[in-house]
Structure formats: structure tokens, C-alpha cells
A protein has these predicted regions:
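Helix-loop-beta segment of a Rossmann-like dinucleotide-binding subdomain
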Residues: 116-123, 203-214, 318-320
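N-terminal Rossmann-like NAD(P) cofactor-binding subdomain of oxidoreductases
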Residues: 1-198, 235-237, 261, 299-302, ...
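Short acidic/glycine-rich loop or secondary-structure boundary segments that cap or lie
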Residues: 158-161, 212-215, 247-251, 265-266
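Active-site phosphate/pyrophosphate- and oxyanion-stabilizing loops and adjacent acidic/basic residues
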Residues: 137, 225, 270
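C-terminal active-site/capping subdomain that shapes the small-molecule cofactor and substrate pocket
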Residues: 235-351
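Oxyanion-binding "anion nests"
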Residues: 188, 192-247
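A glycine-rich, Thr/Ser-enriched phosphate-binding loop motif common to dinucleotide/cofactor-binding enzymes
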Residues: 120-131, 215-224, 328-332
């Protein structure tokens, strides 16, 4: 198979290459595709040196599958070009996720959707939604989802390298002048950067994305809409509050889920423990529960603090964490490509 990684020099593109190193996916040719600024950059892949080519009409010639991690506008422009060249596009941007002719796929939940791609494009969901939906899907099969209320705790890397750089810069400034910080006056030494609306160091910011007229942010609306699409439940009530926190990698989500049928915490632990892509860490008395540090650099969605709602036998609470650069982006995109190959649906449209 001839595989292109578009956006290969970015944070997620770099993670894609690292993950592909250890996967069993047979690759005859790996073609890194990057912006004109990064074209010509040499990368190492499976003991070989590969050179990034600039994105353009000829970049996709002979490619079977193209993994995209580029800004929305770049994906909107170049994903159709890659598809018209004969490649199956697996896209990690928001450009195609809600397009009615583009499947939005989480392999653990809706693998057969990958077969129906009339535009030759398959979308991979938002990183926060992925952490949320993997356990939801596992429990929905047993008890039937009725409603979801979730709050996210999103790492700086969700805003890309600029977000991480801004956080480190602010932490360094706070460390150099700790006196006002210890007196609760961190705002005297920290100023907002260009990535987040307030200083992120020593802080949490209850805004991820622009605020809409209804008071919800774009991120909150995306998470809800994408969860409905992946689960195939267009009318499922999903309410989210998305918060940026001063961690580097790993998005956490606190979840309240209501079901059609009664389900208790013990059964939920058993179901989640047997579900693909999930690892249960749930012994809070011994300090065993998911944290971003636990999830960083690892593939599973970690789930813990699983509790029965004391007022409703049909409701559960839990906390889950996934590495937003791996399962939240690069890994899910690669898993979709593996699914396409596995199902033998490698033609552009899957027909």
C-alpha cells in the first residue's frame, strides 16, 4: 500500500508517523506531504529517510490512502483533490465531519460506516468527543443511551504547538517571580497570550472555541453533534461544558449518562473492561483512577470513578481520559485506515 501523511511535520502528523512505526500495516511507500514551507524536510520512517513533498495536485499521484491532519481550510481544498486522484482520504480536521456524504468513524463503535463514502473521504472525530464516546458506545449497546451531560478538561496541546509553547512560557514566568503567585496574585506576572483568551498557567479557562449566540462554544457544539452522528442517534440530548486546563497532553471528561434500562456500576465496569479500546482504572480507595499523566503516550481510553447515580438507577457517572494526540487524533485516523484495508474496501468510494 502507498500511504500519504498530509501535515506530516505538524504535532499530530509527527505522532502519526511514530504510531505507524509500530503498526502491522503493510506500507510499500510512505509519502510525507507538507506545506511549501516544510517541503524538502527529511524525516525518518522505519529505518529509511523520506523527504516531505509540498502539497499540490501531483502530491497524491499513485497514493492508495491519504491521512490528513491540516487546518480545516486546507482540508476543504485538498481532500477532494486527493480523492479525485484515487486515494481514500481519512481526514482529522473539522471540515468534513458533519457532511452528510462523509462517514464519521470511531472503529470501536461504527466500523461498517467506513464502507459508505461516496466522496472518497472518511472523517475522524474531535479529540474530546473521542474520549467521551468510546465508553458511551460500549454502554449504549447494553442499556440504551437516553441523555448525556459532560464536562471536559482539555490539555494545552489541543490548541497545537502554539498552545503548549504558551503554557510553558507562562509557567516559566510564574516560576521566576513566585512571590506574587504564592500570595494569590499570579495575574500580576501572567498576561494572556495569543492562543488562549486568559493565562492558562495556574488557571482553568471555561471557554474552548468561540462563543455562539446560545452561550455554548463551538467546541461544545461540535462534541455534541459529532457524538450523535457516531452513535447514530440524531435526537440524543448531549450537553457539554468544555474547559481548558494547564496540562500538556490528555483530555479528561466527567460524564453523567442516563439510560433507557437500569444499569449499575459493577455491570458497567465489566462491560467497559471487555470493550475494545478501553482500560478500566477504578479503585479510588487505592488512588487508582485515570489521569492525563496515565494516559499520555498510550492508546486506550481510560475509565474510572464509575458510580451509580444515587437518585436514578438508570444513570451512571464516570471520569475518562485519553491522549488527545493519539486516540484523540493520530491513532483513530490510523485505525480507520487499517479498517479500510481489513474490510477490503480500499476503492475510493468503498463500493
Amino acid at each position: 500500500m502507498r500511504l500519504a501523511v498530509v501535515g506530516a511535520t505538524g504535532a499530530v502528523g509527527t505522532e502519526m508517523l511514530a504510531i505507524l512505526e509500530g503498526r502491522d500495516l503493510h506500507i510499500d511507500e510512505l509519502r510525507p506531504v507538507a506545506s511549501a514551507r516544510s517541503a524538502g524536510r527529511k524525516l525518518t520512517f522505519r529505518d529509511s529517510i523520506v523527504e516531505a513533498v509540498g502539497i499540490g495536485p501531483t502530491a497524491f499521484e499513485g497514493i492508495d490512502i491519504a491521512l490528513f491532519d491540516v487546518p480545516d481550510d486546507a482540508s476543504a481544498e485538498w481532500a477532494p483533490v486527493a480523492a479525485e486522484s484515487g486515494a481514500v482520504v481519512v481526514d482529522n480536521s473539522a471540515a468534513w465531519r458533519m457532511h452528510e456524504q462523509v462517514p464519521l468513524v470511531v472503529p470501536e463503535i461504527n466500523p461498517t460506516d467506513v464502507d459508505h463514502r461516496p466522496l472518497g473521504i472518511v472523517a475522524s472525530p474531535n479529540c474530546t468527543m473521542l474520549a467521551l464516546v468510546v465508553p458511551l458506545g460500549a454502554l449504549h449497546k447494553r442499556a440504551g443511551l437516553k441523555r448525556v451531560i459532560a464536562s471536559s478538561y482539555q490539555a494545552a496541546s489541543g490548541a497545537g504547538r502554539p498552545g503548549v509553547d504558551e503554557l510553558w512560557d507562562q509557567l516559566e514566568r510564574a516560576a521566576k517571580d513566585p512571590e506574587p503567585v504564592t500570595r494569590g496574585l499570579a495575574r500580576e506576572v501572567l498576561e494572556p497570550g495569543t492562543t488562549f483568551p486568559h493565562p492558562l498557567a495556574l488557571n482553568v479557562i471555561p471557554q474552548v472555541g468561540s462563543v455562539r449566540d446560545d452561550g455554548y462554544t463551538g467546541e461544545e457544539s461540535k462534541v455534541a453533534a459529532e457524538a450523535r452522528k457516531v452513535l447514530g442517534m440524531a435526537d440524543l440530548p448531549v450537553t457539554t461544558t468544555c474547559v481548558r486546563v494547564p496540562t500538556v497532553v490528555g483530555h479528561g471528561v466527567s460524564v453523567h449518562a442516563e439510560f433507557e434500562e437500569p444499569i449499575d456500576a459493577a455491570e458497567a465496569r465489566t462491560l467497559l473492561g471487555a470493550a475494545p479500546g478501553i482500560e478500566v482504572l477504578d479503585d479510588p480507595g487505592r488512588g487508582l483512577y485515570p489521569t492525563p499523566l496515565e494516559a499520555a503516550g498510550r492508546d486506550p481510553c481510560y475509565v474510572g470513578r464509575i458510580r451509580q447515580d444515587p437518585y436514578d438507577p438508570r444513570a451512571l457517572e464516570w471520569f475518562c481520559v485519553a491522549d488527545n494526540l493519539r486516540k484523540g487524533a493520530a491513532l483513530n485516523t490510523i485505525q480507520i485506515a487499517e479498517l479500510i484495508v481489513e474490510r477490503g474496501s480500499g476503492s475510493r468510494t468503498g463500493a
